[in-house]
């Protein structure tokens, strides 16, 4: 099989010919139809996140090993089954839950494998979906999507959709709330769709790209703010009668965006941090108790969340915005375009 692999950090991925795995026991071999291109893939390709004081937080320090086949938003067709697999048949169309844990830690024991102490996530800690086939360790990580869901729009549900869903749930939005969505890429757009459909909150979308904000408006944002062209703090305070936002979901999560977020939080507001751009933040410790802020880290979601999300997608409540499609040989181009902010919504590779 062919796979696009990270052999050297920040260098073009190499399309290599590898032996196609043979599934055993509970394993399932999936023929990849679509794999989403995610900012996490970019970080794994570059080999670092931005840490404190501008120092890089290396992916190898987090347990990532190279060479690696990236890609964790994977939809495809069951190709082969181990002898212990139950409930699945060859040629069934599936979405893979990639946030796999070792199964024994406290998080895994309550179904939160995405927060495992020793993660084995596909495309990050083990080979993922930038390939013609991917080996999944157990059939329990597969969810059937039937023939009514397109794999290009289904694949991003495994991360972009799941992460957005988890963030919206963590924001605990009420119908009269004002929520600011910071960053209107693939995740932000799905968060807007979800918040619009299931919360009734007033949605303020914030970005520095007018084109992305136009797409956000079409996907349900009530108000858009270009923070490069106007003062976002002044704009949001005016929109909220000088009270501030009830919740902020930051899909960028860089030092500059979070510093700005802190200036327009209402008392008792929830600040949900999702993005992985990183950096550091100085906090007024007095303001934390006196204004009773809640700062919440939100990382992907559970397989139960993904099943709920697929149901919402089937009902037309949400639909990932897929704007770019690539061949496997164009994997480096896809990552570069995403890094440079040239993909509106989600890019998908079709191996």
Question: Where would I find each of the regions flagged by the language model?
Answer:
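Residues located in well-ordered beta-strands
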Residues: 2, 14, 31, 75-77, ...
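Short, well-ordered coil/turn residues at beta-beta hairpins
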Residues: 34, 97, 249-251, 351
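NAD(P)H dinucleotide-binding glycine-rich loop of Rossmann-like/cofactor-binding domains
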Residues: 58-72, 100-182, 213
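Local beta-strand N-terminus motif with an aromatic residue
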Residues: 91, 176, 221, 244-245, ...
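Mid-domain Rossmann-like dinucleotide-binding core that forms the NAD(H)/NADP(H) cofactor-binding site
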Residues: 93, 147-230, 234, 238, ...
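C-terminal hydrophobic helical "lid"/dimerization subdomain
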Residues: 259-263, 267, 303-351
